[in-house]
């Protein structure tokens, strides 16, 4: 009897560990992403207010020092025209970032890309982006800040370890097959974004791009849990509640008509609701 009990207990432990492994695999370890840093810098140089925060001054001063000579680069001029004519800003910028690969190529099928990106302008933008990367020595800048990036990730890890992805499954009564990513954005102040992309393996990848707006006595970014955790929970909730937005389009349009002005000030158009 003792032997049977021991076997059953061992099986229960193994099953629990398997469940934990499956849920933990939903949540990817936080990182600083060079695609996000590059696009943030580009739209800082265009003059977009939301990408011109200096809350993490230790880092943004380095950006200004390195990239100021390129404010009139042909890419920046082209990007300014996209801001003016198509409203490329806020989360549209981050949508482009996560759709790129690590060589800054855009896949042939980029259906997840935000609709504010004019499909006729995407090719020229990518071509100029690659030229900007080379001309501005972006890779050298990124590598020179790797210690800062690693320290930021280290400071974020306690929050990452406290996230219980199984809670979502239990609360909503359904399992999401999405993969959740946390990207630490170093220059965007309190700007936080939640873009998503479906990859070639048909896995839906949900991103929480977290800004940096609180620093310690020496100017290094910190991540107070009481500020950060609610934002993460909010962003990842979308994966469970945004299954069929068309069901609510009519009522959403009626509500938006009453509050549209206030929502627009928060960079939320009807499509974001």
Predicted features by range, described:
Residues 1-25:
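Bacterial Sec-dependent N-terminal signal peptides
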Residues 243-267:
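Post-HEXXH active-site segment of zinc metalloproteases
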Residues 194-226:
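Active-site scaffold of zinc-dependent metalloenzymes
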Residues 75-167:
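Long, mid-chain structured domain cores
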Residues 145-204:
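Auxiliary, metal-adjacent structural segments of Zn-dependent hydrolase domains
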Residues 226-247:
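Active-site recognition of the HExxH zinc-binding catalytic motif
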Residues 271-273:
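Conserved small/polar residues in nucleotide/adenosyl-binding loops
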């Amino acid at each position: 009897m003792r032997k049977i009990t021991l076997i059953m207990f061992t099986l229960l432990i193994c099953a629990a560990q398997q469940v934990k492994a499956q849920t933990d695999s939903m949540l990817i370890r936080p990182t600083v992403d060079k695609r996000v840093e590059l696009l943030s810098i580009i739209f800082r140089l265009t003059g977009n207010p939301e990408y011109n925060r200096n809350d993490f001054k230790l880092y943004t001063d380095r950006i200004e020092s390195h990239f100021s000579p390129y404010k009139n680069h042909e890419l920046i001029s082209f990007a300014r025209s996209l801001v003016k004519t198509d409203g490329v800003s806020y989360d549209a910028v981050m949508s482009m970032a996560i759709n790129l690969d690590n060589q800054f190529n855009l896949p042939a099928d980029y259906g997840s890309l935000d609709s504010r990106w004019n499909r006729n302008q995407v090719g020229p933008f990518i071509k100029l982006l690659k030229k900007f990367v080379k001309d501005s020595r972006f890779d050298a800048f990124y590598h020179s800040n790797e210690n800062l990036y690693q320290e930021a990730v280290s400071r974020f890890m306690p929050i990452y370890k406290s996230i219980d992805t199984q809670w979502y499954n239990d609360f909503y009564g359904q399992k999401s097959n999405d993969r959740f990513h946390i990207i630490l954005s170093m220059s965007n102040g309190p700007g936080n974004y939640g873009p998503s992309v479906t990859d070639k393996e048909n896995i839906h990848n949900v991103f929480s791009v977290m800004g940096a707006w609180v620093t310690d006595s020496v100017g290094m970014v910190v991540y107070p849990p009481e500020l950060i955790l609610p934002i993460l929970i909010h962003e990842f909730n979308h994966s469970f509640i945004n299954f069929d937005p068309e069901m609510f389009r009519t009522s959403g349009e009626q509500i938006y008509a009453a509050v549209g002005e206030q929502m627009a000030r928060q960079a939320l158009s009807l499509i974001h609701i």
